[in-house]
Amino acid sequence: VRKLFSVTLLAASMLASVTAAQEAPKADAASLEELKAQIKVMQEQLKSLEAKTAAPAAKPAAAPVPATQIKWEGSPRFTDASGATFKLRGRVLIDGVNVDVNRDTGPSYKSRQYRARQVFLGAEGQFGAFAYRIEGGAANGGAWGWDDAVIEYKTKSGLLLTVGNQKVGGLENLTSIKAITFMERGPFGDLTDNGFVLAAQATKVGKNWSLRGALQGDSINKADVSSGAYIANNAKERSGFMVRGTYAPIMTADDAVHLGVSARYRDTGGETGFTYSAAANTAYKPQTSTGGVLLSTGAVGKSDTSIAAEAAWKHKTVSVQGELAQIKVNRVATTQSAANGGKDFNIVTGYALASWFPTGESRPYNAAGQFGKVKILNPIDKGGMGAFELAGRYDYADLTKMSPNAVTALASQPGLATAGTYKGLTAGVNWYPYSNVRFMANVTKAKVNNRRIGTIENDADVTVFQARMQIEF
């Protein structure tokens, strides 16, 4: 602009000179022509500068997009230019457990333990249509082992194919230990053996329904079968399959109704028979070292078929859920094991729970037939008090249909003395200062009724107090 002003001023001055020259005597015609030529040049420059001034200024160039983007999701998730992702994950669960067992006959006992329920570390990521998830650590003071160790592929039609160490199925089991309402899943989870197994699974999730099926083996943490338990040359690992279907006739942010069914078949192959045992809402099982086992059949199952039904309802801050399963046990032959063999029988187990958030939170439900992690409305870093959850659960199990065989004495069939019934009530309170931090307290009162074998009747009244501090990312 300053340059334009200078040129304009110069041009005006030269025009004034021309006018003065025209009024003067025409003494020097050559000088006048030269002056006119200079004025013409100046006019062209003036037009050029005016055009440049009128043109809009060019926009500054956009900042280049970083090659790798970082998003905070409890821990950083890295995404590169191709869309590939990587994220660390982990959890630490520290428990204090107090167990008090009073028995009618046999020794009563008390036990207390402070323990790392889980210390796990892992990672997850994605490469195009392929994804992976791997997580392992130490549980219950044991050696390192793997939970999730899977590779996933999602087709264009939305079918999810998963291969690796993964959960078996069921409403409560598919809900992560980081998000379940109580510290443990109780006898239902113990008896249905809903752990992690190597499997090839296909899952399809619709708007409000899901369907999954899997071919299953044993846990990735178990060593290869080198010889058979009953026939040395029959070194086959256990195997089976599972199907589960769910439907939610109501599914909104505030309300949900969940219905589900599942079926599972397992065969031991050449391994030792399946054992069906349970503890009173705790992963800490002092029964194995003091006072004997409270509820167990022993290794009696050659194969089994489980049929289960699921239901859940939630309305805003309140939710109710339950599962009921029947396990048809095909027992090992008495020719293979006189102690464990006998007639086939059925086990029935189930639970019902209720949960309430007085602070206004709601358990999130999704179309895959699962409950997820609770979102805290007023975390303490925002000046709030976090979230509180109050809950109660009733557990039931009946193993009494297991009958004795006529091959050996009753005292030589150890599972008979502990194949009884379990009835228990658990109350819990949870505090969530943040979405990824939780403090839990549970108290369980349970009654185990077992049959009398000779002079021994292993009935027991069990009281468990336990607390947990949990952080996950």
PLM regions with names:
Residues 1-22:
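Gram-negative bacterial Sec-dependent N-terminal signal peptides
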Residues 31-42, 53-54, 120-124, 148-150, ...:
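A general secondary-structure boundary signal
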Residues 67-69, 112, 300-301, 444:
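Short, solvent-exposed secondary-structure boundary motifs
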